[in-house]
């Protein structure tokens, strides 16, 4: 280990920054955020330093560096574009046993500054020891995506609860289980982020009052249309915290590969060799797993509240008093249209878009007259088996037979396939496509020839 990672308490302590340019500004921001009493020395300063000085946030000393500026300092940073000046600052600091960082010259410095993920009071530092700053930055960006923005608020709140938790739970094991439940409670984290004191109090009291083994919850997560890159950051965080993931066939293998390795996986979709699990049975699976005290993720393709029956599942949980939350996903209409070069709205062709289910409960009927109106785009979910009926009804209610249509199979996936034509051909076109597929009807489909980008990659 070439460097010892430490966190310095600089609040109200004198620090010196030598340099007045853009690089020095970035260092100054970090020192000010840490509460340092900062003096900045340079021959000239960019405007931001003057702004800070006028606000009383730091002291500017214009002119050449002098060793006396280090008097009383705890820490120094040399951030000029003059190597000789930087070396002078480093040597002067070294002689006084003051730690000094020299920008872009780790061998000349007595300390280096890592890439930082700030979720105060939680801090994560990443460093390559100065050998590969770009690698450290890329790793920091990866970690940033995995750590929720509100994590710091959760950590701060946990600090307020420590004494009470220690008093209520006698053993270390009980305390550990409680803290694990608290740190992955998405409803609590969201309430803290929203400064909803009432909800925070209610959730906390519920967690403290119930037996530890009976504090399960369900998170309804939209997996997006297929491409794993379209899964939201919050969705990724949830599937990596799950004890059990209940999923269907619209969730891609690439997304399932991101699920926490030791999580149980329950498949409830329809696949060759399997029977489709009835919705009521799915509801009971969610209920049963949550009642075991487990963190359950119900992972659904697209967005769970757009033809995903998410509302029905949550009604069951609500009736049973099971805590739940929802993470929306990119719905298939948005993903498939974007990846097939079909804008759902366009000033010249469509001022509205309608998302329509291709099948209803028994006895249901669509409002075909309004669906056949001009200047709109129709997107039919689960409509492949009803394509001939959709064609017949739309034409019967006045839509032109030459209206452009597109069928998007496996939208956003590497194996995406798009079949296009006109409304009069829809029934026949559907025979060329396999589920899962989406039907898009509207003048905007004609733009596909110009705007299609995905198939070219």
Swiss-Prot record:
Ranges for region Precorrin-2 dehydrogenase /sirohydrochlorin ferrochelatase: 1-204
Modified residues (Phosphoserine): 128
InterPro entries the record matches: 4pyrrol_Mease, 4pyrrol_Methylase_sf, 4pyrrole_Mease_sub1, 4pyrrole_Mease_sub2, CobA/CysG_C, NAD(P)-bd_dom_sf, Siro_Cobalamin_biosynth, Sirohaem_synt_dimer_dom_sf
Catalytic activity: uroporphyrinogen III + 2 S-adenosyl-L-methionine = precorrin-2 + 2 S-adenosyl-L-homocysteine + H(+); precorrin-2 + NAD(+) = sirohydrochlorin + NADH + 2 H(+); siroheme + 2 H(+) = sirohydrochlorin + Fe(2+)
E.C. number(s) listed in UniProt: 2.1.1.107, 1.3.1.76, 4.99.1.4
UniProt: NAD(+) binding residues: 22-23, 43-44
Keyword list, A-Z: Cobalamin biosynthesis, Lyase, Methyltransferase, Multifunctional enzyme, NAD, Oxidoreductase, Phosphoprotein, Porphyrin biosynthesis, S-adenosyl-L-methionine, Transferase
GO molecular function, one term: sirohydrochlorin ferrochelatase activity
Gene Ontology annotations of biological process type: cobalamin biosynthetic process; methylation; siroheme biosynthetic process
The keyword NADP belongs to this UniProt entry's keyword annotation: no
Pfam families reported for this sequence: CysG_dimeriser, NAD_binding_7, Sirohm_synth_M, TP_methylase
Region of interest (Uroporphyrinogen-III C-methyltransferase), ranges: 216-457
Signal found in the keyword field: no
Coiled-coil stretches noted in the UniProt entry, renumbered to this chain: none
Pathway where it operates: Cofactor biosynthesis; adenosylcobalamin biosynthesis; precorrin-2 from uroporphyrinogen III: step 1/1; Cofactor biosynthesis; adenosylcobalamin biosynthesis; sirohydrochlorin from precorrin-2: step 1/1; Porphyrin-containing compound metabolism; siroheme biosynthesis; precorrin-2 from uroporphyrinogen III: step 1/1; Porphyrin-containing compound metabolism; siroheme biosynthesis; siroheme from sirohydrochlorin: step 1/1
Gene3D superfamilies attached to this UniProt entry: Cobalt-precorrin-4 Transmethylase, Domain 1, Methyltransferase, Cobalt-precorrin-4 Transmethylase, Domain 2, NAD(P)-binding Rossmann-like Domain, Sirohaem synthase, dimerisation domain, Siroheme synthase, domain 2
Family according to the record: In the N-terminal section; belongs to the precorrin-2 dehydrogenase / sirohydrochlorin ferrochelatase family.
HAMAP family: Siroheme_synth (MF_01646)
PANTHER family: SIROHEME SYNTHASE, SIROHEME SYNTHASE-RELATED
NCBIfam families: cobA_cysG_Cterm, cysG_Nterm, PRK06136.1, PRK10637.1
Function: Then it catalyzes the NAD-dependent ring dehydrogenation of precorrin-2 to yield sirohydrochlorin. Finally, it catalyzes the ferrochelation of sirohydrochlorin to yield siroheme.
Protein name: Siroheme synthase
Source species of the chain: Citrobacter koseri (strain ATCC BAA-895 / CDC 4225-83 / SGSC4696)
Top-level taxonomy: Bacteria, Pseudomonadati, Pseudomonadota, Gammaproteobacteria, Enterobacterales
Encoding gene, per UniProt annotation: cysG
């Amino acid at each position: 280990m070439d460097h010892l990672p430490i966190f310095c308490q600089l609040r109200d302590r004198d620090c010196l920054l030598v340099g007045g340019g853009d690089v020095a500004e970035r260092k100054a921001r970090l020192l000010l955020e840490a509460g340092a009493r900062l003096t900045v020395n340079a021959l000239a300063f960019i405007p931001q330093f003057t702004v800070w000085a006028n606000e009383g946030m730091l002291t500017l000393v214009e002119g050449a560096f002098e060793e006396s500026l280090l008097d009383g300092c705890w820490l120094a940073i040399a951030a000029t574009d003059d190597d000789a000046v930087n070396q002078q600052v480093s040597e002067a600091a070294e002689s006084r046993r003051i730690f000094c960082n020299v920008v872009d010259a780790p061998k000349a410095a007595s300390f280096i500054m890592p890439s930082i993920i700030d979720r105060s009071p939680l801090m994560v530092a990443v460093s390559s020891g100065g050998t590969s700053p770009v690698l450290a930055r890329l790793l920091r960006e990866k970690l940033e995506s995995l750590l929720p923005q509100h994590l710091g608020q959760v950590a701060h709140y946990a600090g307020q609860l420590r004494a009470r938790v220690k008093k209520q739970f006698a053993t270390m094991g009980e305390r550990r289980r409680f803290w694990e439940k608290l740190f992955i409670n998405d409803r609590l984290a969201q309430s803290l982020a929203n400064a909803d004191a009432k909800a925070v109090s209610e959730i906390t009291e519920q967690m403290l009052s119930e037996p530890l083994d009976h504090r399960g919850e369900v998170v309804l997560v939209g997996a997006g249309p297929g491409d794993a890159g379209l899964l939201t950051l919050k969705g990724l965080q949830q599937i990596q915290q799950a004890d059990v993931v209940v999923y269907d066939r619209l969730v891609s293998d690439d997304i399932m590969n991101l699920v926490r390795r030791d999580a149980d996986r329950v498949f409830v979709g329809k696949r060759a060799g399997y029977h489709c699990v009835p919705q009521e049975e799915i509801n009971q699976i969610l209920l049963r797993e949550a009642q075991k005290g487990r963190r359950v993720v119900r992972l659904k393709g697209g967005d769970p509240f757009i033809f995903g029956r998410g509302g029905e599942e949550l009604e069951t949980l609500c009736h049973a008093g099971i805590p739940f939350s929802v993470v929306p996903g990119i719905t298939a209409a948005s993903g498939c249209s974007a990846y097939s070069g079909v804008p759902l709205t366009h000033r010249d062709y469509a001022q509205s878009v309608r998302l329509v289910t291709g099948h209803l409960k028994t006895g249901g009927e669509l409002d075909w007259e309004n669906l056949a109106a001009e200047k709109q785009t129709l997107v039919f979910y689960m409509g492949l088996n009803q394509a001939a009926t959709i064609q017949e009804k739309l034409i019967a209610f006045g839509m032109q037979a030459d209206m452009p249509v597109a069928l998007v199979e496996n939208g956003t996936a590497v194996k995406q396939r798009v079949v296009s034509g006109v409304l009069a051909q829809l029934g026949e076109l559907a025979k060329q496509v396999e589920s899962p597929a989406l039907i898009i009807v509207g003048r905007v489909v004609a733009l596909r020839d110009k705007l299609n980008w995905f198939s070219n990659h």
